[in-house]
Amino acid sequence: MSDDQTSLSKSAVPKKSRDWSTKIFLSFLGVITVFYAVILTYHVAKPPETVADDSGLLEQCRQICLQYGLVTTGNIRKDAQAYLDVVQKQHLTDGLSVILADSSFKPSESQSIALLNQTAPDFSLADHTGATQQLSVLGKNRPVIVVFYLGYGCSHCVAQLLALDKDLHYFRELDADIVAISSDTPEHTSERYKEYGEFHFPVLADVDYAVSQKWGVYLPETEEKPEFMNHGTFIIDRSGQVVWGSIGKEPFLDNKTLL
């Protein structure tokens, strides 16, 4: 065999090896491409905002609950009840006439909020079914308690709604109603209802925080501070005036004051 033939036969083996290496490398790149395509498709089809929001709320709830020695379990309804058991001081069990006649009780005073003694800003928002609810209709010739909460991913927020739902019959005896508002979408609230059960008053979606900002509970981002959402509880009288209000980092749980 000539030297040229020998050289050619030796070079044929590395060429095949390179071909296989190229095929394996290209196959690997193909797998990676498909993997990232699947991830991209998932995030386009199902945006992560709701999950991210819930994660942030759960962390915020965890920090607040730790102040009371409570450890979150991930079960929002269970954690909400645990928060109520520790934080809520007034548990209403007597009849309404007895509660209202209690002269020893000192109700919490209203904060000096901007809306105090002003006409309540009207709103039209969707409930968990997608139906539109309007404050001027809900509160026509009747008192309304308007509650702003951070969403159903927040156990201490849900605690306030649980407490109000438990005492709802007292408010109904006074011909008053309750409406709760958060940035949760109607679909998200509906999913939570299926998991944990419904409340017996309207729970509305203020997805863009427009209503929350008008009521002074949502503070948009500025150059100095990030955006922030407070809890807010307001009493609207029969004439549509805001006669009492509370805004803060934790929910207002003294239902006796609201009566």
Residue ranges and their predicted role:
Residues 198-202, 219-234:
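Structural micro-motif
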Residues 124-125, 235:
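Hydrophobic beta-strand positions
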Residues 227-259:
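Thiol-/selenol-based redox modules, centered on thioredoxin-like
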Residues 2-119:
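N-terminal targeting signals for export/organelle localization
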Residues 159-213:
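Structural microenvironment flanking redox-active thiols in thiol-disulfide oxidoreductases
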Residues 133-164, 177:
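Short active-site neighborhood of thiol/selenol oxidoreductases, capturing the structured segment around
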